[in-house]
Amino acid sequence: MTGMESPRDIRARIARSQWTKPTTGLAPAYAQANVVILDRRYAFDFLLFCVRNSKPCPILEVLEPGVTEPHATAPGADIRTDVPLYRVWRKGRLEQEATDITGCFDAGMVSFLLGCSFTFEASLTGAGVPVRNIEEGKNVSMYVTNRKCASAGPFSAPLVVTMRPIPNDLVMRAVRITSRYSLAHGAPIQVGDPGALGIRDLDRPDFGDPVTVKDGETPVFWACGVTSSLAVLSAEPELCITHAPGHMFITDVLNETLAAL
């Protein structure tokens, strides 16, 4: 794919299983979203979890039970087919990965779209801040931390973060740029000290791929929407569906419409 393709065109390819890889760098001008789909019985408590933990779980859209089209963020899209790779969970255990969840989706399911840090990557690169996972053609590095989120009903989780190595002299620029995107996790939660988050080895992420951290660079950590997936697993619902880490839903929402002045 090229960066010139529209979100609609990319989603069409994804729906045909022509793209099943991570979405970092795709449609760089448009916001991407984490996906959580679960039974309506759990929807309010999960919504409350997101509200209480808005840094890792900023809400872009919530679909009514049984609705498959995200009318606000991607009219005409289908939440059942337009994610490159889904994970299907039964009682907290991974049952399968799939590129189409039409057979699992029923009229009682509520879909949540939550902000993603891929949204601000184009602004970083546009300002001369390198994004290593894009440079190396990898998924972003994600780590489970020692910080606990506020619980809600059966939902609880440790905070998950992404890490991007930033040249030392560009760290403040990266902080300023990303702080404008509160619906894409906003400013970093930690700069330069993985140990403070309980991260022992940057070369061993819990999700995604390891990336190169060069001399003269600082590891910078942002809250991550995979936190929401861990929260859902903690509740052990009979069935829930999430995106596979790094395989996001691409919306029609321009990044800049999510940015503060």
From Swiss-Prot:
Family, according to the entry, reads as follows: Belongs to the D-glutamate cyclase family.
Origin organism lineage: Bacteria, Pseudomonadati, Thermodesulfobacteriota, Syntrophobacteria, Syntrophobacterales
Which EC number(s) does the record attach to this protein?
A: 4.2.1.-
Q: Could you tell me one molecular function GO term of this UniProt entry?
A: lyase activity
Organism of derivation: Syntrophobacter fumaroxidans (strain DSM 10017 / MPOB)
Q: Which InterPro entries match?
A: D-Glu_cyclase (IPR009906), Putative_hydro-lyase (IPR038021), UPF0317 (IPR016938)
**Protein name listed in UniProt:** Putative hydro-lyase Sfum_3393
Gene3D superfamilies named in the record: PSTPO5379-like, PSTPO5379-like domain
Enzyme class, spelled out: lyase
